[in-house]
């Protein structure tokens, strides 16, 4: 299945009324809120491990309230939320990770271990649940990497407010988050004096995206918002040029040694900023004119907003990430 067809499928599924799942409906098992699961993933090409960092209760659940079991759970990894003691599976999604990319690099193949921070967004449970994160082999076999129970009343679940000082603008709002695909354009490398540029970029790329298929025919089921925390410096790091910038997300060219690969390892900062608006997926819009970007499935994508191929980069990298 192509990425475009996958987008169409997810948008269509989100419009179908809630149907029975397991032993009940969405409201029987989940609140209309988000459980943010932060974890660390570490190892090398031959070994990998996961460890829980923290749990956070955030705002409204942006995902669908029906079809919580992904019919096509692509990706190197999978997360499952189940009733305790081997009960029904209540939620399931496939995903990729930054560490999954690292495992294919030269340093990882020579045994150099690295640790990276990751996040999953889940519907917030009404009762105690079991959460399992597993690696998936090409043939479909799974290896459990970490599993734990979550008590929604537990004091270990943080409930602080999202990062302050963040600007949120509407690019295109079609409806309720449960019934729409919610895309957040998170700005990177925009200073306080460049917020108007960020707002113009959000509107420009919203218009472009919704003019192309499959998004054009599904625009009544897509919400797009812009989210930005001003950066001290404009632009992003370019290590091979000796250019270093203090920015909100710490994004950098030359990720994993590839000149055009543009990613961020500051996942917690990214998620703290993005939490100011409901989202299913993140597009990091970088204030730069150099050709570059990247995309991780069900994580995020990046693209540079001011080069001659910016529109192509957005559509291409979004296809990798969602």
Predicted regions and their residues:
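Extended acidic/polar, glycine-enriched regions
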Residues: 109-177
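Bacterial N-terminal signal peptides that target proteins for export
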Residues: 1-9
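Catalytic Zn2+-binding segment of zinc metalloproteases
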Residues: 318-322
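Short pre-active-site segment immediately N-terminal to the catalytic Zn-binding motif
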Residues: 195-198, 294-315
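Fold-level signature of zinc-dependent metallopeptidase catalytic domains
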Residues: 154-216, 226-238, 243, 252-255, ...
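Catalytic zinc-binding patch centered on the HExxH motif and its immediate surroundings
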Residues: 235-237, 267-301
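N-terminal prosegments of processed precursors
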Residues: 23-118
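Bacterial N-terminal signal peptides
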Residues: 8-18
């Amino acid at each position: 299945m192509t990425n475009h067809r996958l987008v169409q499928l997810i948008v269509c599924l989100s419009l179908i009324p809630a149907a029975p799942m397991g032993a009940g409906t969405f409201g029987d098992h989940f609140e209309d809120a988000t459980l943010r699961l932060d974890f660390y993933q570490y190892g090398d090409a031959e070994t990998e491990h996961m460890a829980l960092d923290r749990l956070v209760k955030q705002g409204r659940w942006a995902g669908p309230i029906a079809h919580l079991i992904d019919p096509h759970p692509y990706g190197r990894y999978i997360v499952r939320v189940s009733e305790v003691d081997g009960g029904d599976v209540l939620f399931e999604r496939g995903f990729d990770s930054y560490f999954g990319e690292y495992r294919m690099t030269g340093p990882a193949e020579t045994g150099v271990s690295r640790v990276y921070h990751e996040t999953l967004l889940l519907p917030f449970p009404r009762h105690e649940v079991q959460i399992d994160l597993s690696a998936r082999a090409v043939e479909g076999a799974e290896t459990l990497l970490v599993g734990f129970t979550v008590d929604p009343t537990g004091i270990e679940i943080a409930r602080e407010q999202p990062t302050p000082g963040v600007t949120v603008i509407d690019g295109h709002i079609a409806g309720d988050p449960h019934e729409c695909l919610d895309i957040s354009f998170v700005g990177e490398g925009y200073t306080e004096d460049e917020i108007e540029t960020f707002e113009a970029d959000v509107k420009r790329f919203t218009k472009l995206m919704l003019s192309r298929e499959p998004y054009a025919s599904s625009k009544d089921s897509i919400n797009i918002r812009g989210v930005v925390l001003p950066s001290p410096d404009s632009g992003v790091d370019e290590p091979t040029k000796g250019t270093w910038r203090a920015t909100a997300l710490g994004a950098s060219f030359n990720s994993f040694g590839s000149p055009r690969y543009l990613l961020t390892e500051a996942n917690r900062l990214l998620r703290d900023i993005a939490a100011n608006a409901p989202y299913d997926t993140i597009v990091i819009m970088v204030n730069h004119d150099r050709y570059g970007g990247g995309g991780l499935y069900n994580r995020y994508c990046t693209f540079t907003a001011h080069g001659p191929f910016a529109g192509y980069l957005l559509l291409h990298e979004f296809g990798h990430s969602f």
